[in-house]
């Protein structure tokens, strides 16, 4: 698996060292073991996990800036993209948030096993923890989950003014077009769209770079359940 992972990293032009490689493969080992008794991901084959979780998450690596010091991954699941990015960026602090206890228990295990001092795991919801963390983060992360107009309402309030949100999406959806109202209300705008291909399957991936231009009204995010039922 090591050679396969190295080849993938080289194809997507992400640099690595032996420490990052060792921790990533340990993460893979823990995930495979945990997933055998607790369903964290439907992808179960080693090479598929490396490409569709690890390398897919690391498509963000070259979009991160030196000045990006605090990042939040909302709905992180089994830790993608936040945990693998934390392994590759020990100088940056990552908050991994998920409301499902079995997932955050797993993430705590990974954090402790890999001695990742730059990772904070929180079991909870964005609407519950925003009070103490409003406009505290440089970068917001989220892979796939929810419609863009919904996840914008969760993510943008956490970002500092001039902070960026880097959602990962599938190419060919109407989500961008349908998110114009949410972007306006939350004082944010799309800077750029990046199209990538996964290194082995050649599957298309999209990363959207969104800038927070001004403070967000403190009534956002709305109470639990409302963003999903009544998107902006």
From Swiss-Prot:
Single GO cellular component term: cytosol
Pfam families: GidB
Disulfide bonds: none
Binding site for S-adenosyl-L-methionine: 75, 80, 126-127, 143
Enzyme class: transferase
Enzyme Commission identifier(s): 2.1.1.-
Similarity comment text for this entry: Belongs to the methyltransferase superfamily. RNA methyltransferase RsmG family.
Protein name according to UniProt: Ribosomal RNA small subunit methyltransferase G
């Amino acid at each position: 698996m090591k050679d396969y992972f190295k080849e993938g990293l080289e194809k997507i032009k992400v640099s690595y060292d032996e420490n990052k490689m060792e921790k990533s493969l340990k993460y893979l080992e823990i995930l495979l073991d945990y997933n055998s008794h607790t369903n964290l991901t439907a992808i179960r084959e080693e090479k598929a996990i490396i490409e569709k979780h690890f390398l897919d998450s690391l498509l963000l690596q070259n979009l991160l800036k030196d000045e990006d010091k605090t990042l939040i991954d909302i709905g992180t699941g089994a830790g993608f993209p936040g945990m693998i990015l934390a392994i590759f960026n020990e100088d940056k602090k990552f908050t991994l948030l998920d409301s499902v206890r079995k997932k955050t228990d797993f993430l705590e295990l990974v954090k402790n096993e890999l001695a990742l001092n730059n990772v904070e795991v929180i079991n909870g919801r964005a609407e519950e923890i925003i009070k103490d963390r409003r406009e505290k983060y440089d970068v917001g992360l989220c892979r796939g989950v929810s419609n863009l107009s919904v996840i914008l309402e969760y993510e943008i309030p956490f970002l500092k003014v001039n902070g960026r949100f880097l959602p990962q999406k599938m190419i060919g959806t109407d989500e961008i077009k349908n998110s114009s109202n949410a972007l306006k209300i939350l004082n944010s705008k799309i800077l750029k769209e990046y199209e990538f291909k996964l290194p082995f399957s050649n599957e298309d991936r999209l990363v959207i770079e969104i800038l927070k231009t001004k403070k967000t009204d403190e009534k956002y995010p709305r109470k639990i359940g409302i963003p999903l039922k009544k998107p902006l």
